[in-house]
Amino acid sequence: MTILTEMFTATPSLSGFSAATKILLAVGAQTPTRDFLLAQKTREMLMQHLAHLWQMHPGMLIVTPTTPNAGWPIGGGDLKNGVSDANTSVRTMTFVWLANFTGCPAVSIPVGLVKGGDGKAPVGLMAMGEWGDEEELMEWGREGEEWAWGEGRMERPENWVDVLGLAKGDV
């Protein structure tokens, strides 16, 4: 609700947005002031609690699954037409909402592949860090990916492209 309301108030025109995004922003426009203020109080309380935890445990990363479910197969028209599955979207945000709501930096890494549909679907871990501590998160993510893609673990899909390597000119 908070993000939708903030997005709506910062958007001068809805032209250029998809129909689904326009609907979400319209929902944000209908948020009662009372609910918005209660959400801000909740955010402040959560941020104070997290700040206390980091004061007690400097450098702590909060690690959770990225989502409570593995990725799902891409359907025939999904890439062309998109997908609108609100239940799955909400379910996949089970663990990421705290970082989103409190503005904490977070990074997700792949840690495995499970059977799903015609192939394999990714599963991941997410780490959330203290505000301003992005370097530690990036190091955790780099080490985690090196481990995940290490010898005998996960294999990259045939269509995988190393975009960072391409950008650096390493590929």
Where are these regions (language model features)?
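Short amphipathic alpha-helical coupling segments at ligand-binding clamshell hinges
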Residues: 39-42, 91, 136-143
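Short helix-loop capping/hinge segments that flank enzyme active sites or metal/cofactor-binding pockets
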Residues: 1-51, 60, 65, 108-124
